[in-house]
Amino acid sequence: MISSVRKFFQRKPLVVVIRLDGVIGAVSRFGSGGLDDSNTQKLLEKAFEFEKAKAIAIKINSPGGSPTQSSLIASRILKLSEEKKIPVLCFCEDVAASGGYWLACAGKEIYSDINSIIGSIGVISASFGF
């Protein structure tokens, strides 16, 4: 009887889940926009504050965007994971392309559906043709 009561009150392993959805880039002056370092900073820091967390699960759905913002967000994820000693598991939903895949690479493991669009990190460059 006592052991079953004790099991009931024991804490289960905690996995913190956060979502990173949208185009990666700076927020416009009208307040709309996607993911950037400034608007993901508090979310990520709060996720890593849970001392009992066994892992952080990041659900990603992004076609990519700004290389600079992708790098800053991914670096923050890696830094927090190392500092807090909490592994990050990334789950790619519909799309994790370009910068979205860059974010997923910040995790220890990447999971996706067989139908998810993954990868395709590239750069579009325009020139005057000479």
Regions found by a protein language model. Name each.
Residues M1-F130:
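Terminal-region recognition feature
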